[in-house]
Regions:
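Short beta->alpha linker loops
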Residues: 28, 52-56, 80, 93-97, ...
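Substrate-recognition element of Asp-dependent hydrolases with the DxDx(T/V) motif
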Residues: 21, 33, 80, 98-128, ...
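Asp-based, Mg2+/Mn2+-dependent phosphohydrolase catalytic module
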Residues: 1-12, 103, 119-236
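Active-site neighborhood of HAD-like aspartate-dependent phosphohydrolases
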Residues: 2-50
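Short helix-capping segments at alpha-helix termini
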Residues: 39-42, 68-72, 131-136, 164-165
Length: 380
């Protein structure tokens, strides 16, 4: 990840993209395209995901129609899928850190603009399901309200004009390449939060690339810093996952000396897609053994080049025997850091043990220790 030089410019406002930056739209898009392409005897395989990210609805529809050889025009395809999308807007969840960021900037009097390639009507419909969002933005601009959509800088110039601010005093937060390109063309500072996995290397034009909004450090840009980090940890809304313990890759104990208790992701792929890759912690309940402190990684483990997103919890207790097949319940209550690659196995192991120490200390704090009594941990 690239790192911004602290306080390079005095930032006075923040311009945010919507889909993929604040809202987890990707899953809805995939589901709608699976249904729509199925009607034509086609199967959505995700190959257009990068090409359509950040594009206008017409551009995205054109790419899908051409690539899959559909017997319809882009306009006709949009007419077919628009009702399907409208039915799903109520189900789109805010991405981790989105509500936190909006509330923090609003409470500190930092003007915010919502600037999306989506039509204005679509933007209003989506954010109507998220309390307080509409009133938090000083300006909302849709792609149909400017002459040329991103990657043209028009939408960002318009945002600065409506706020009566110089473009150089604006910080753009974007998840897609068109958005980053547009922000830099407007001579604004740009933080990229890639919504697609393993694509950070494509965002070299951005001033900073971060893993998720949870990792945003506003003080780098002269903005009021977050104050909710506690002893190297960030509290998150608790989330839950469980199932029988399965055999993993066999490298936890043998290669790393760290015995992880692996869970199948088959039934939790949608849940895992909602959470950024990184290191989390919380409590683990084993049906026949009790409740234990836990630290875990979510992601692709770049050192080992995993092909699929996995979850690998480490129960912070010495067990005398394996417990494959036993029911394991996890309550995740905090975040430590983003996923990262390491130059050596030794540095990876050292970092994992540091994560353990951070988690063990944090879980003694009342704000985290209270979750040890969560009924989910004792369910079977």
């Amino acid at each position: 990840m690239s790192v911004a030089n602290p306080l390079r410019k005095s930032i006075k406002c923040v311009i945010l993209d919507l889909d993929g930056t604040l809202l987890n739209t990707d899953g809805i898009v995939c589901n709608v395209l699976k249904v729509s392409l199925g009607k034509y005897g086609k199967e959505w395989d995700g190959r257009e995901t990068l090409q359509i990210a950040g594009k206008t609805p017409f551009e995205a529809a054109s790419a899908v129609v051409e690539d899959y050889g559909l017997p319809c025009s882009p306009i006709e395809f949009i007419s077919e899928i628009s009702p399907l999308f409208s039915d799903q807007w109520c189900n789109i969840k805010a991405l981790p850190g989105a509500n936190r960021l909006i509330k923090h900037l609003k409470s500190n009097g930092v003007p915010m603009v919502l600037a999306s390639n989506s039509p204005r009507e679509s933007i209003d419909a989506k954010i109507s399901f998220h309390d307080g969002w509409k009133d938090s933005f000083s300006v909302i601009i849709g792609g149909d309200e400017v002459r040329t959509a991103k990657p043209s800088p028009d939408i960002f110039f318009e945002a600065a004009r409506r706020l009566c601010m110089e473009p150089s005093s604006c910080l753009v937060i974007e998840d897609s390449l068109p958005g980053v390109t547009a922000g830099k063309a407007a001579e604004m500072e740009v933080v990229a939060v890639p919504s697609l996995p393993k694509q950070s290397h494509l965002f070299t034009a951005a001033d900073e690339v971060i893993n998720s909004l949870l990792d945003l450090q506003l003080e780098k840009w002269g903005l009021p810093p977050f104050t909710d980090w506690v002893e190297g940890t960030l509290p998150v809304d608790p989330w839950y996952i469980g199932g029988p313990v399965i055999k993993g890759f066999g490298r936890g104990s043998k290669v790393l000396g760290i015995p992880t208790a692996n869970l199948s992701t088959k039934d939790y792929s949608d849940l895992l897609s909602e959470h950024p890759a990184g290191v989390y912690f919380g409590w683990a309940g084993l049906s026949a053994r009790g409740i234990f402190k836990m630290v875990m990684s979510i992601g692709w483990n770049p050192y080992f080049s995993n092909k699929e997103k996995t979850i690998e919890p480490w129960l912070l207790h010495e067990f005398s025997e394996d417990f494959y097949g036993e029911e394991l319940r996890l309550v995740i209550v905090g975040y430590i850091r983003p996923e990262e690659n390491f130059p050596s196995l030794e540095s990876l192991i050292a970092k994992i043990h540091e994560d353990r120490r951070v988690a063990e200390r944090a879980l003694d704090l009342p704000m985290y220790s209270s979750h040890k009594n969560d009924a989910y941990l004792r369910s079977s």
